């Protein structure tokens, strides 16, 4: 089974092709997430259906937007991390060819070793010390506003006096304390068996961890008389460092900020690893997260979402509603002037009131989407028929409805078998049987579109 046959489901969920760019995947996710966000739906059944769809879309985006996860998915076609079935035993022809491409090419390291040893040897023979991971606990406001943090750290550095050997320097003469590595017998690499599928095992050469691939290492002094006076025979010293971490506005939780070359130094390593600061979440963010209906983890985008409920009269005549308190302590109030009609299904888009765009030189933000729920009155809400008449008189009539009322009345004037339907059930458009589309007269659609073009609502 080819990779394209077994690994297209997540691409289909987002409606993109396998060769889609990161931006195309992000754009597709934002459109679908806005369309299927469960808070847009009042009906409980519709809410539950779209909640499932929303979670499926988000899960697909989390994998396809991550290069490492996407690569794994493209290869194995399984978003749960395990290889999907291919061939008779879960190991297909493509996997078999990849195995031989990885382990039986490029010759060997010195002409006498296992084929493919050179690649494995080079990959394992790292010249850099290990990275250090540090968690930073932040609030949503910290991420929105940005924050500068200082850390007092102690890091290990190689002793200058003994150059990391741990031995007391000898005057006038140079003494070496290198010995052959017994772990790899001086070869610098060791043979290891690696499993690539059911019944498929190969021998692979990897760098020796004890000597770091050199075949030898420096023997540490045991007698305190031979200890370096500065590092007491350890070869390393502890050094205090003040590290400044700038959390720029617009970061998300799970983002990683890297400070290059400031990890611990290690003996026999030519370069230092990095400090990696992982942005984690403080628990007091729950209320704000519920207000903005957003996943604030990494890759979540810059748009924010919230919702309001208005009455039918407010939808027709305008309204002024408090929205929320922003992360920079502003109070946002939405004002829709009389004359602008908000229709069922409309979503109000407020530009530049979303999440900050990371490293944007102009300080731009994403957008704030406001899902509008229109609360209709219950049946038989009126007290007098005169109230209904007043509404009919003041509201504009539909020309399309009038045209339907007069169609073919002259030809049908002699018919006596007329019937008025009063027993019916009103259902939501989302609950229509599959394949049935709601009818929209062209004149009504045109008028609707013209009215909507004058203000910033999207559907």
Swiss-Prot record:
InterPro entries: DnaJ_C, DnaJ_domain, DnaJ_domain_CS, DNJA1/2-like, HSP40/DnaJ_pept-bd, HSP_DnaJ_Cys-rich_dom, HSP_DnaJ_Cys-rich_dom_sf, J_dom_sf
CXXCXGXG motif repeat placement: 159-166, 181-188, 208-215, 228-235
PROSITE patterns associated with the record: DNAJ_1 (PS00636), DNAJ_2 (PS50076), ZF_CR (PS51188)
Chain ranges of zinc fingers (CR-type): 146-240
SMART domains per UniProt: DnaJ
A Pfam family reported for this protein in Swiss-Prot or TrEMBL: DnaJ_C
One cellular component term from this protein's GO annotations in UniProt: cytoplasm
Domain of life: Eukaryota
Ranges of residues in domain J: 7-79
Keywords of the record: Chaperone, Membrane, Metal-binding, Mitochondrion, Mitochondrion outer membrane, Repeat, Zinc, Zinc-finger
Compartments in which it is found: Mitochondrion outer membrane
UniProt GO BP: protein folding; protein import into mitochondrial matrix; protein refolding
Molecular-function annotations in GO: ATPase activator activity; Hsp70 protein binding; protein-folding chaperone binding; unfolded protein binding; zinc ion binding
Other observations noted: Present with 1210 molecules/cell in log phase SD medium.
Protein name as catalogued: DnaJ protein homolog XDJ1
Native species: Saccharomyces cerevisiae (strain ATCC 204508 / S288c)
Lineage: Eukaryota, Fungi, Dikarya, Ascomycota, Saccharomycotina
